[in-house]
């Protein structure tokens, strides 16, 4: 069967594709866009089947692995659509695209679908606004073997193109979910998972907390930190010691510090 070829940037399918840049459309359709060879490859490796894979041979000249990825997607049952350069650049989200773009099921699941393994390490992000921070936390979670990331009262969604891009595609390899703050804490409480909240308002340093066993590490929004509700419902509070003039760290940095302390403690046991 011959692949569909689209050369006109005004093609209706491309216009429809562009609507997936809007969160509401992603939520209504359950579809998102993943762009780039690395990100799309990781999605496929994680078992995500693209509905459609768009590729531009002209832009893939410097990406030899691109052709192999197209064939992998074809073998997995994805529709393959070839785009001319102008058409591809119309729908590409990033500058200097490499000629690979896929329409995939949006990442994320409901908490009801999640089974935590024994000794699970959970990262709980409440009210995080910037997609880049969520992406950075995903990369940390992937590297550290985090079992689940929960976005509580998220300002953005897991299918945001900037989340996918900044995560380098790890949004597909790390289990992710979204819920309200109450729902997230209720679910963790029902599972018997203690929540360790990060806040400057405590004397307990993160290295002195017991982060072995099943535990959730909670971080809050970039501007306000964790809400009073989240702090009140958490089991423990810890702070990261700081000796400089700045009174706070980037939320993704804070998450990485505490998550890797949990990893260190588990290896020491």
Give the role of each language-model region.
Residues 6, 32, 126-127, 152-153, ...:
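Glycine- and other small-residue-rich loops at beta-strand/loop junctions that grip anionic moieties
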Residues 102, 140-144, 155-170, 228-269:
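Structured adenosyl-cofactor binding patch, chiefly the S-adenosyl-L-methionine
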Residues 196-245, 250:
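Active-site/ligand-binding-proximal alpha/beta "capping" segment
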Residues 23-24, 115-123, 233-243:
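Glycine/charged-rich beta-loop-alpha catalytic/anionic-binding loops adjacent to active sites
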Residues 1-93:
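N-terminal positively charged helical leader segments and presequences
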Residues 38, 45, 72, 81-86, ...:
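RNA substrate-binding interface of SAM-dependent RNA methyltransferases
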Residues 49, 76-78, 97-98, 118-120, ...:
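Short coil/turn connectors at secondary-structure junctions
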């Amino acid at each position: 069967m011959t692949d569909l070829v689209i050369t006109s940037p005004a093609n209706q399918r491309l216009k429809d594709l562009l609507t997936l840049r809007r969160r509401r459309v992603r939520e209504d359709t359950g579809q998102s866009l993943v762009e780039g060879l690395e990100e799309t490859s990781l999605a496929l490796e994680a078992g995500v089947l693209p509905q459609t894979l768009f590729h531009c041979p002209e832009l893939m000249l410097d990406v030899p692995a691109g052709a192999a990825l197209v064939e992998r997607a074809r073998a997995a049952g994805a529709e393959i659509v070839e785009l001319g350069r102008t058409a591809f650049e119309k729908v590409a989200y990033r500058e200097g695209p490499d000629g690979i773009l896929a329409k995939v099921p949006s990442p994320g699941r409901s908490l009801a679908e999640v089974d935590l393994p024994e000794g699970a390490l959970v990262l709980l992000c409440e009210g995080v606004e910037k997609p880049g921070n969520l992406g950075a936390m995903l990369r940390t979670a992937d590297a550290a073997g985090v079992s689940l990331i929960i976005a509580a009262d998220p300002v953005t969604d897991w299918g945001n193109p900037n989340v996918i891009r900044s995560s380098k595609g790890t949004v597909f390899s790390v289990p992710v979910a979204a819920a309200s703050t109450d729902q997230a804490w209720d679910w963790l409480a029902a599972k018997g998972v203690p929540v360790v909240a990060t806040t400057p308002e405590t004397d307990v340093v993160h290295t002195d907390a017991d982060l072995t066993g099943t535990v959730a590490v909670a971080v809050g929004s970039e501007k306000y930190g964790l809400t009073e509700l989240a702090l009140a419902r958490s089991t423990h509070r810890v702070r990261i010691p700081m000796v400089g003039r700045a009174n706070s760290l980037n939320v993704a940095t804070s998450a990485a510090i505490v998550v890797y302390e949990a990893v260190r403690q588990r290896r020491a046991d």
